[in-house]
């Protein structure tokens, strides 16, 4: 289309004024509320609805933060590297660091205090009685690849009663390395058999760094379990499978294809 100069000039001026008018309609205003976050909304809804039995956690699904459908995290890290003899791949580690890697206390002279916690979501135990045979079992270890807990350090398990008070039901004060072992407790006190039951693990140690480490795995709460809680029957990977590469855990495909025979490790060993 061949437009004369006056017409093209008028079109250009019209477009300029339209752009200025449109630009004038935009104003920067502060947010009046936080935009909804679908992920956070799902987590919050999981916290509102009580968990039902059986409660089962082997820490194999989530890495880093524990499963928000089951837990309220207070600093623990789900990993597979802080212990060399876990019952299966994945466990939660307690130490003196927050989840973001910062210490709870910046003063190295503070030798003991509460550090990481791991709290269950609300669990509905309403309608159960002391005769319902509710059992809780878990596997735990001390030190592993971290520092050995000191004399005043401990790992504590607490139950929340009907009045909302936390009652200590188990603790251990390991002064030496302890490989993973199991513990089984009866939940047969009527104070704990209510609709808003919770339990939590609390670590006490040096809160200024990666000290006084504990690990936790296979946390199970169930009624009349059809298995022996002290005998795990789980077809599971016990550690991270090693790389099929000879020299690396991973490498660019282009580099591998240059010499696959050289880069491939012995997959039979």
Label each PLM-derived region with a short phrase.
Residues 1-11:
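Bacterial N-terminal signal peptides that target proteins for export
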Residues 19-21:
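N-terminal signal peptide c-region/cleavage motif recognized by signal peptidases
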Residues 26-85, 222-251, 256-264:
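Extracellular carbohydrate-recognition regions
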Residues 59, 120-144, 195-205:
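Extracellular beta-strand-rich recognition modules
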Residues 75-130, 215:
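Surface-exposed, low-complexity/disordered Ser/Thr/Gly/Pro/Asn-rich loops and linkers
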Residues 111-117, 149-150, 205-224:
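Extracellular carbohydrate recognition
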Residues 115-120, 129-139, 250-269:
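Contiguous beta-strand segments within globular domains
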Residues 163-192:
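Extracellular carbohydrate recognition and processing domains
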């Amino acid at each position: 289309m061949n437009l004369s100069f006056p017409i093209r000039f008028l079109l250009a001026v019209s477009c300029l004024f339209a752009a200025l008018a449109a630009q004038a309609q935009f104003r920067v205003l502060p947010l009046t509320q936080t935009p909804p976050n679908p992920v956070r909304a799902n987590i919050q809804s999981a916290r509102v609805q009580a968990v039902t039995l059986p409660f089962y956690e082997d820490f194999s699904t989530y890495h880093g933060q524990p499963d928000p459908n089951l837990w309220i995290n207070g600093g623990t890290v789900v990993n597979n590297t802080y212990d060399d003899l876990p019952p299966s791949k994945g466990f939660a580690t307690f130490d003196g660091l927050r989840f973001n890697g910062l210490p709870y206390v910046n003063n190295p002279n503070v030798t003991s205090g509460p550090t990481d916690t791991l709290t269950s979501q609300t669990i509905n135990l309403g309608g159960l009685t002391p005769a319902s045979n509710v059992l809780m079992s878990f596997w735990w270890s001390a030190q592993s690849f971290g520092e050995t807990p000191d004399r005043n350090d401990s790992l504590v398990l607490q139950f929340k009663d009907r009045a909302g008070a936390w009652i200590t039901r188990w603790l251990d004060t390991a002064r030496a390395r302890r490989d993973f072992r199991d513990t089984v407790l009866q939940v047969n006190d009527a104070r704990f058999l209510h609709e808003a039951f919770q339990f939590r693990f609390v670590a006490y140690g040096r809160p200024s760094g990666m000290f006084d480490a504990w690990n936790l795995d296979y946390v199970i709460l169930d009624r009349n379990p059809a298995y022996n809680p002290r005998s795990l029957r789980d077809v599971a990977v016990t550690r991270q499978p090693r790389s099929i590469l000879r020299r690396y855990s991973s490498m660019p495909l282009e580099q591998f294809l240059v010499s696959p025979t050289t880069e491939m490790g012995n997959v039979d060993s």
